[in-house]
Amino acid sequence: SQEKRQRIERVIRETKYRPSEYARTMRTKKSNRIGVLVPQIDSESVPKILSGISERMDQKNYHVLLMNSNLSLEKEIGILETFEQSQVDGLIFVASVLTKRHEKALEHMGVPVVILGQKSEKYPCIYHDDEGAACAMMEELLKSGCRRPAYIGVDRRDKAAGENRYRG
């Protein structure tokens, strides 16, 4: 009845009742949360990447859960487990490396995944062609008459790009 509805609405207002987010997630199977895992929060490119992700997720009414691994493989695996427990609807993994352990943990999560920064055969990915770009730069230098080009860039041990850029 209308009277009952008004009484319920009054009690809701007076008690400042808010429905449980957990219960809603259980009912709808959707949390409206996206996990974002970054390897190093203070790297050159991560703030720009996060800005773009945040802007797009705001447009879609998703909350971004951000975690930083500080370049620790063990921490990354733990963070992926945390995201799974948090019932994220999807994951964006800004990866400096993508190992079999990562792939196993991602598979176990059972949510859509996008990999940024590494090539993947299993998951949609966005990455730089570091080797191709370095090769194109070298060709341009040689065409312009440079005979002893030097490589000055990230260390070859840099897992994300070093060896690929050096090969190029």
Regions picked out by a protein language model, each given a short descriptive name:
Residues S1-N32:
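N-terminal helix-turn-helix DNA-binding module of bacterial transcription factors
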Residues L66-L73:
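Short beta->alpha junction loops
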Residues M26-D42, E140, R148-R156:
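Short beta-strand segments enriched in small/hydrophobic residues
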Residues R10-T15, G52-H63, E84, H108-I115, ...:
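Bacterial carbohydrate/catabolite-sensing allosteric modules
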Residues E74-Q87:
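Short, well-structured alpha-helical segments in soluble
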Residues V88-V94, A150-G153:
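Periplasmic-binding protein-like
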Residues V97-G110:
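Active-site-adjacent beta->alpha loops and helix N-cap segments on the catalytic face
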